[in-house]
């Protein structure tokens, strides 16, 4: 990148090189080799916006009912990879279908966050659990978040619900709503503090509008072209936390940090 333009070099069989010059409006592309002409500019650009053909096997699935369970299947040519999960994360989590209400993904994610802290330190966080099935905890969050059948939960109602619930059971926490995640990097930063994250997916092709609990990550670093980040989640549909969401997927993410005191 220089002079307000991006230059892409593509090598063919180690013998020839095509140089593409892309202007910063993302709509114009031209080769610097006059014998090669491209007319479908947007199609060419879309090939490179996804971290390039040379650095990935296939793009991660980004469609309905297709789940990511093995991020390395979609990455190659990286210089470094990092894998991390929270301590004591691997257990069976609650799903939305375990509770009677509908459009209840945010309360379910909140139950799973409380369940995580309770399981990690049952002495300190004993009061987070009210009943064996966590039904009362779910119902409390459903009400505290002003969740409604048909419309779900507003992002703006989640943080205050955590603080209210922790206070209600004799504990305290600092909960904060954050906007966007820098392709998942901000979730990585928070997980590195050894805390789960309430992750809110918007316009996601697999999950639509959905809340999940972030428990770990897989991150691949490419020299000169940034990172590709996958967040490991308890998604509220499967009890096992073995699915991931990709930081480069369609839509956008907000998130709530919850710091017990």
Per-region residue spans from a language model:
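Tryptophan-centric aromatic hotspots in well-structured domains and transmembrane helices
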Residues: 1, 7, 104-106, 203, ...
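Exposed beta-strand-loop-beta-strand "reactive/processing" segments of non-cytosolic proteins
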Residues: 1-22
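Active-site-adjacent structural segments surrounding the nucleophilic cysteine of cysteine proteases
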Residues: 4, 25-151
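Predominantly the structural core of cysteine protease catalytic domains
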Residues: 103, 112, 143-221, 225-227
